[in-house]
Structures are given as structure tokens and as C-alpha cells.
Amino acid sequence: MCLSLLLTVVSSRAGAADDPLARARLLYNQRQFQAAVTAAEEARSTPARADAADLVAARAYLERFRESAATDDLTNARERLRRLDPQRLAPRERVEYIVGLGETLYFDQSFGAAAAVFESVLQSGELLAVVARDRVLDWWADAVERDVRPRPEMDRRGVYSHIRERMEDELALHPSSSTAAYWLAAAARGQGDLQAAWDAAQAAWVRSPLAADQGATLRADVDRLVQRAIIPDRAKSSAQSPQALQQEWERFKDRWKR
């Protein structure tokens, strides 16, 4: 996920041509990750900018790893995060650094540790644009869920309850949060509260136009959740057939078709 390096781009495109660090940031935001790494390595030759350059390179390597799953990319990201001095970063860059640590832990499958790192970013409440915060929130919820999967059912339900509470709070503060709308339904389902999951899925569907992309991504995600998880679970626990629940869901979507 490209999170919030856009916050740190202050140079124009023309200026980026003469400034390798600005060029690296611009290329990162354009998803040209190898070119961003190359520009960051050039910027690193200036000692005062080496740490910021390593941060851009680390984030670019993390994005490459998400696309390729090549272990070298994850190793390179970890190496750059390990060697940079966060005290030399600007405040917004330090937030990016912490998010990068969380992503690296997540990709290392240290999900509990990753969740703790993402939690610290969310709790700070500072220096994150709304869209970037939404993505960190998604990283957090996914890391928490993956961490709890092997645990006993009683433990899982308690964790899903925590996710629900967090998402309710997020929606109260940020009504356009697609992540909170989705995870409110997903966590209710994980907790075994299937009626609440169904209700939250419908609520997410109708509020989806608040999202930056007019709700296209949220609706697709909610539709998968309902059809692959909530409907089968409700059918098992009620007298309704999967076909009847599917028809009910389709009628609901038709009423709110855009």
C-alpha cells in the first residue's frame, strides 16, 4: 500500500529533476519502485539526506515485495530501515518509518508485533491524512485477525470485540472510512454475531459513496464478505437456505443500485 509519502512531497516536478530525493519520492508515488530505489541511492550520497533516502528506498522495496513476494526485496527493506537513524527524520517521515516497521513485521508474519506498531500510529492521531489513516487501520485489523486465528475460540471472540469497538469509534470520527465500515461487518461475523454482521454489511453498502472512490472498492469487498462468509454462516445457524439469503441480499443491492 502506498500510504502517505505524498505528504512529504513538497518539490515540483521540475525541482525533482535536480533533486534525487524529491525525484525518489515522486517516483515512489507514481509506483515506479525500482526507479525510486535508484534515485534514493543517488540521494544517499549526500550524508544529510541519507536517512530520508533510505526510508524512501525501504518503502519502495516493501511495495515491490507486495507485488513480487521476492525475499530479496523484503531483506533490502529491512536492511534500510535498520541502518537509518530515525532521529534525523522529519516528523512526518518518522510516521512513515513506523508504518514501514509495521509492514516489515507483517510480511515477516510477526502479526502481533505488527499490530502493536500499527496501533501506536493510530493512537498518536497525528500527521496522517484520512486516506493514509484508513490504510493503516486496515493493516492493523488484518494483522490482529491473522494473529488471533490460531487461538481458542474464546480468545478470538474477545479480539473481534476489540476490533468492532475500534471500528465503531473510527466511523464516529471518520464517517468516510471504508476500512471501518468493512471491518465492522467482518469482526461481527468473526465474533459469531451474524445478525450484526448482516446489518453492518448493509450499512457499509449504503454509506459506500462517502469513500474516495465512490465506494467501488468497499462494495466489492462487502459483497465478497457477504456471499462467501456471512450468508453460509447464517444459513447454518438459521432455518433460511443459502439461496433465500442470497436472494435477500440481491434484492437489497438492487434497492441501492447506483
Description of each model-found segment:
Residues 40, 47, 81-88, 124-126, ...:
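Alpha-helical junction/boundary sensor with strong preference for TPR arrays
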Residues 79, 119-123, 155-159, 194-213, ...:
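TPR/TPR-like (Sel1-like) alpha-helical repeat modules
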Residues 7, 12-76, 250-258:
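N-terminal leader/linker segments that initiate helical-solenoid repeat arrays
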